[in-house]
């Protein structure tokens, strides 16, 4: 029993890692120690009273539901206590998630009843709470279309790509939940690519590969996150190739995500890359300032946090990488305000997030952008600063200026100075020109996406 509860807690952590930001997971949940020595009970030990209270108030209900769902045991009790591990009990320290074996989404045996079918979908990830902006507008619109008409070959497969923490997983779950909302009998499964690999290997070892095939090829929709984890896994790729063909021919929906464009994924069979491109491939970019502010305000509303708009604007200006980073920052601010009893002001946020803000300032600089753009277009950095007005130089220069405005905290005059002492109005014109071209010119939009993704990595 103790071993079963220990494994249950590890599987619970896997689901929690998918459902909350990495910063929150590392701050509040990873340090917890689980005592599984008592029957039907998991006791989580927190390092101090503040952590105990925070976990109880913000995560205990979520943890309990996941654990009860995974174990099919509504009587299972999860408790949080302050202190370190009891000397007389075996306490399981948290392992690295990457090394944890996966148990909870194994393929169903042939005789398993429909009632036991588990989609692995996060019920909280919906279209309604997905904050839409220019960076993800197309992806959301197509996702909604797929949810309403799964299997339509115009968007099958749907391939979403972009950096970490930009909302790909949220959108994946939203589409899956949307499909089920339209057809409660639809067999929809969400799974991370790494878990798919583990299940495949486990099925091979247990000589249950036919059950594995039958399960995945019987689905109405298969949603696989981070498909780049298939790289170098030849056996898994071969099996997925056949599963893909079976689902596609049966007009069943396939949705995949990756951190890069299909053709850029290394060590993936060319046959698979070709199939990834059969439907629609859509980039999700880092959110622009307006979207970042909207995300912060939405998250604050969901968590019942009073966040002044000027504070949201300040955080949005400073943290530009991804949604998880924004949510992690908001949670840290809330925790500190709750602990100290102080009001959430710009000065309070600046002090609370000083390490994050200092790191962000170091990550992307105008100089980094100039170097990356020059390499991308195979020109020299000196060309970007020169008076050369030929199209082959002027367009990359405008793009670099627009990227500097988007990704750094430098003012327009400071950016202009870095590009050969140009006036701030020149920078403003460049930003407006690139914004217009991104709407009308697919090549410019693709260049922008590639550079944003590289600089934000």
Swiss-Prot record:
InterPro entries found in the cross-reference section: AAA+_ATPase, Chromosome_initiator_DnaA, Chromosome_initiator_DnaA-like, Chromosome_initiator_DnaA_CS, DnaA_C, DnaA_dom, DnaA_N_dom, DnaA_N_sf
Any one biological process term the GO annotation gives: regulation of DNA replication
Stretch list, region Domain II: 81-119
Keyword field contains Cytoplasm: yes
Pfam families tied to this protein: Bac_DnaA (PF00308), Bac_DnaA_C (PF08299), DnaA_N (PF11638)
Domain notes: Domain I is involved in oligomerization and binding regulators, domain II is flexibile and of varying length in different bacteria, domain III forms the AAA+ region, while domain IV binds dsDNA.
UniProt-listed PANTHER family: CHROMOSOMAL REPLICATION INITIATOR PROTEIN DNAA (PTHR30050:SF2)
Name the UniProt record assigns to this protein: Chromosomal replication initiator protein DnaA
Organism annotation: Mannheimia succiniciproducens (strain KCTC 0769BP / MBEL55E)
């Amino acid at each position: 029993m103790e071993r079963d509860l220990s494994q249950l807690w590890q599987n619970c952590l896997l689901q929690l890692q998918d459902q909350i930001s990495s910063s929150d997971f590392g701050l509040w949940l990873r340090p917890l120690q689980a005592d599984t020595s008592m029957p039907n009970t998991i006791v989580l030990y927190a390092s101090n009273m503040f952590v105990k209270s925070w976990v109880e108030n913000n995560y205990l209900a979520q943890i309990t539901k996941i654990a009860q769902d995974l174990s099919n045991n509504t009587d299972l009790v999860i408790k949080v206590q302050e202190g370190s591990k009891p000397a007389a009990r075996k306490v399981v320290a948290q392992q690295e998630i990457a090394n944890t074996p996966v148990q909870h989404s194994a393929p169903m045996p042939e005789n398993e009843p429909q009632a036991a079918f588990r989609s692995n979908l996060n019920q909280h990830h919906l279209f309604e709470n997905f904050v839409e902006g220019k960076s993800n507008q197309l992806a959301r619109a197509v996702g909604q279309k797929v949810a309403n008409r799964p299997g339509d070959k115009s968007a099958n497969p749907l391939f979403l790509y972009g950096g970490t923490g930009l909302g790909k997983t949220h959108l994946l779950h939203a589409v899956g939940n949307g499909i089920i909302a339209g057809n409660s009998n639809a067999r929809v499964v969400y799974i991370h690519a790494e878990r798919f690999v583990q299940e495949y290997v486990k099925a091979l070892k247990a000589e249950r590969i036919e059950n594995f095939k039958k399960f995945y090829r019987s689905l109405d929709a298969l949603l696989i996150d981070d498909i780049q984890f298939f790289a170098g896994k030849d056996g898994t790729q071969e099996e997925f190739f056949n599963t893909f063909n079976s689902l596609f021919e049966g007009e069943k929906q396939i949705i995949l995500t990756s951190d890069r464009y299909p053709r850029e994924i290394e060590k993936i069979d060319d046959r698979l890359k070709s199939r990834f491109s059969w439907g629609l491939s859509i980039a999700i970019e880092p959110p622009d300032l307006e979207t970042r502010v909207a995300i912060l305000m939405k998250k604050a509303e969901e968590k019942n946090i009073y966040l002044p708009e000027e504070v949201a604007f300040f955080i949005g200006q400073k943290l530009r990488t991804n949604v998880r980073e924004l949510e992690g920052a908001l949670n840290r601010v809330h925790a500190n305000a709750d602990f100290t009893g102080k009001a959430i002001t710009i000065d309070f946020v600046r002090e609370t997030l000083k390490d994050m803000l200092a790191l962000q300032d170091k990550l992307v600089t105008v100089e980094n952008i100039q170097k990356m753009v020059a390499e991308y277009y195979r020109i020299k950095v000196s060309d970007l600063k020169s008076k050369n007005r030929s199209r082959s130089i002027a367009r990359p220069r405008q793009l670099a200026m627009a990227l500097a405005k988007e990704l750094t905290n430098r003012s327009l005059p400071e950016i202009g100075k870095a590009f050969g002492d140009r006036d701030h109005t020149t920078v403003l014109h460049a930003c407006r020109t690139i914004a217009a071209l991104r709407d009308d010119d697919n090549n410019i939009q693709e260049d922008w996406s590639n550079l944003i993704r590289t600089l934000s990595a």
